[in-house]
Amino acid sequence: MAIHKIRAFFNLEASGGIVLALAAIAAMIIANTSLNTWYESFIHAPVAIQIGSFSIAKDAHHWINDGLMAVFFFLVGLELKREVLIGELSNVKQIILPAGAALGGMIMPAIVYLFFNYNEPEFWRGWAIPAATDIAFALGILSLLGNRVPNSLKVFLVSIAIFDDIGAIIIIALFYTNDLSLGSLAIAGLCLPFLYLLNRRNVTSITPYLLIGVIMWVAVLKSGIHATLAGVVLALFIPLFDRTDPEHSPLEELEHDLQNTVSYGILPLFAFANAGISLKGAGFGELFHSVPLGIAAGLFIGKQVGVMLMCWLIFKLGISTMPKGMNFKQIYGAALLCGVGFTMSLFIGGLAFAGETPLFDERLGIIMGSIVSGIAGYMMLKATLKDEVNVTSVDLTRHS
């Protein structure tokens, strides 16, 4: 009986978001109790890998953020490739609206953040933190509404998140890269022809790709570019189809194999390692510092304004039309859910303010903005979709 209940839970579309939320809540509770010492020891525990004279030594926190999150970005890359080649993003007309919405949803939060910090140039580097959307949380919240949610709304939200991920990848590569090591970068670059050759020769075994991918990840890690980007690049070379057997898709097979590991292992572990905010001794200044306030306002206000403004502009100019089965109220609900930045915002925040002084904690703003956006989006869509159901039932009665 218990096993059936566990299986039923993991079959829920919302289960990934629920596990992620529980991991974050657990981290916050532990960080504010006597267990905080254990928590700090866990995330700062030294972990080293040594092969001969070569070694990589980092603490657990960095291994999670640089290593395990590379697997997450690898999965994101696989999803991007599939969607662009055969999915929702394969048609130019289909991608204009979510692409525009994602662009607006990245620009406006950054503007809001910079408005809050315009007198503090040293904090400007946090501008990209509220530009992100956490698709696991957003879809988890959306799935709580059950089968009332039209498929077009799910596709719209997922498409925005995909373009959001593309934007985040570009931002990390361009703005959060340290001093470059050209030698390491050259080694990473040398991996690309080998990956291309494997793809062109229709090598469908994943093992050689992963072996080269590990070498590329180490080189990128040493180069100064964030190591997670190696995961995205590797994903682009995984074959979508086996040319000798069109029914076999190595990419989709790998995507399926990684989904549960990422959703129920890597992302919750990342949330646990990054959301442990200790509020002991935190005063008014720390809680209402311009950085966390700017992030929270960027996620809640900037996201919805940016997404809605771009959608309105696209409709007004006749560039695209309203997706079938959707209306402006539903788009607004989706725009609110886009303000749930959690995972990617925490990730970018760790890059922007690594080793920052205790004047503020950017994670407070991420959590505040994400919670308010999630609740507001859920309430808006619950009311809107309920209205839609009621309208439908009235129409059916009228025509009977």
Swiss-Prot record:
Domain of life: Bacteria
Range of residues in the leader sequence: none
GO biological process: regulation of pH
Keywords in alphabetical order: Antiport, Cell inner membrane, Cell membrane, Ion transport, Membrane, Sodium, Sodium transport, Transmembrane, Transmembrane helix, Transport
Protein's cellular compartments: Cell inner membrane
Catalytic activity annotation: Na(+)(in) + 2 H(+)(out) = Na(+)(out) + 2 H(+)(in)
HAMAP family assigned to the protein according to its UniProt record, in alphabetical order: NhaA
Name of this protein: Na(+)/H(+) antiporter NhaA
Organism name: Psychrobacter cryohalolentis (strain ATCC BAA-1226 / DSM 17306 / VKM B-2378 / K5)
